[in-house]
Amino acid sequence: MNSGSRIELLSPRLANQIAAGEVVERPASVIKELLENSIDSGAKRIDVDVEQGGVKLLRVRDDGSGISSDDLPLALARHATSKIRDLEDLERVMSLGFRGEALASISSVARLTLTSRTRDADQAWQVETEGRDMAPRVQPAAHPVGTSVEVRDLFFNTPARRKFLKAEKTEFDHLQEVIKRLALARFDVAFHLRHNGKTILSLHEAHDDAARARRVSAICGAGFLEQALPIEIERNGLRLWGWVGLPTFSRSQADLQYFFVNGRAVRDKLVAHAVRQAYRDVLFNGRHPTFVLFFEVDPSVVDVNVHPTKHEVRFRDGRMVHDFLYGTLHRTLGDVRPDDQLSAPIVTAVVRPSGPEAGEFGPQGEMSLAANLLQSPQPQPSYTAPGSGSGAGYQYQYTPRPQSAVPVAEAQAAYREFFAPLPGAEPGAPVALPEGGGDIPPLGYALAQLKGIYILAENAHGLVLVDMHAAHERIMYERLKIAMASEGLSGQPLLVPESLAVSQREADCAEEHHSVFQKLGFELQRLGPETLAIRQIPALLKQAEANRLVADVLADLMEYGTSDRIQAHINELLGTMACHGAIRANRRLALPEMNGLLRDMENTERSGQCNHGRPTWTQMGLDDLDKLFLRGR
């Protein structure tokens, strides 16, 4: 800073251009602000015309309430808005826009024309501005009820900003993504998009479930809904509904993730963490889940005014929101069974609370879920495999038992015993399915074993292929988790306590969450303003670096109010135990053993994926088999 320069007020033009740097980054930023204004005006149809990716032209026309001629100049002024009057309004704001600076910022870096007409006006009025001329010119115009905003030559007066724009296709892709997000947020509004004269999107109003499903399919692709779980739950003033993709429908990029808070699309670290936790055990490494979720909460407990573009929000009780999201998604994914995945065309697994305590998860959400499952086992159907002829087959009846809380060692021993060779076991004959397809379990009955690796089974839909090691590994893993939940986390005292240097804020956090650390098997003591002593760590993690583990947990607690680091480490150990305890490749199984494994899969959470996220089974329908052999052509 030049010591001789004096402090001066910035010109309105320069001030708006500085503000535009925060609000207007690219054409997609402009379309977001214009569409939000249209939605706030009560529009039921919005038409968008774009040329050259939005750099040459952006035109948005709506059938909303319109703007009166007296208010038109104010619409282009900074900090002028019709949406809030005082701080109380700001704290409970439900409109998408409220700051009153978007149009002023846009008009400072582009040529803007705003035309509008209210329902009780005899004619429309138009106002024009350019970046170099901030004085608006108002004149009569012809226009139906509603508003049109035309933005031409974006960044024409700021060449440096224009240089940072990408290729036309890239800019249009960003712009189209904004429209898709808003179209998902508002099913009651029709959206039509044209680019260089070509229709790209034409989405009509959606007022029923079928219409909403069509819109989601149009935006996310038909494959998403076919591989998605509908979800809806409301508890303690929080409501979550929408669709979550099955783990098998994951993506290499996080490009099919839509989360809305009170109708506003947001990208929030707390939400991302909760979703990542829920999918932790079922996603292959490096893959990303898919979801379209709508979260509704009292607007007074969420702050939407924490980011210039309003992409981020802050919850008053982030811990409660995190646990609610994680618990709901975790239960939904855990409730998926093979018969759900075979449902067509859409898997249905709507989560509803079963009582006043339903859906409540504490700091150890996953372990609380396991405890709930232990306390209230659900009855399961019994399947009886009919013989294939007198003396030619076998009678096999399987009644699934509730998963009981047994010590980890006993759980492994029981499974080793279960899969020990049966005395005098013979391969036997495959079971013939009953005519009419009645009483056939979802994964059917085993036919044979291939190379000691895969189980071939027949169900009502056709052929089922099962990776027996991966499937058994998941069953073992889930049972070990339940056993661990019942036993709890025992602590291992350290012979020599370890000293950990932390910030004062981290030390305060450790004291505040003392009970959380105790439940995790830690014993911490504060020795000074910025020093902690680690006196005990979880017994299962005695080989881990205690200092690093505690530091990571503290970082999570300060960021999210909860931590899954310990559970992740423990799950990794249990996964290793399950892998070593599972049946190996080239192990020959008798048909009763194969069928026993299939029945266990049907009654085990997340049995569709192994511990590493790979699929454990796949279905080949008769149509798929016919295509292989060109039948019917």
From Swiss-Prot:
GO terms for molecular function: ATP binding; ATP hydrolysis activity; ATP-dependent DNA damage sensor activity; mismatched DNA binding. One of its GO terms (biological process) is mismatch repair. Keywords: DNA damage, DNA repair. Pfam families: DNA_mis_repair, HATPase_c_3, MutL_C. PROSITE patterns: DNA_MISMATCH_REPAIR_1. GO terms for cellular component: mismatch repair complex. This protein is involved in the repair of mismatches in DNA. It is required for dam-dependent methyl-directed DNA mismatch repair. May act as a 'molecular matchmaker', a protein that promotes the formation of a stable complex between two or more DNA-binding proteins in an ATP-dependent manner without itself being part of a final effector complex. Belongs to the DNA mismatch repair MutL/HexB family. This is DNA mismatch repair protein MutL.
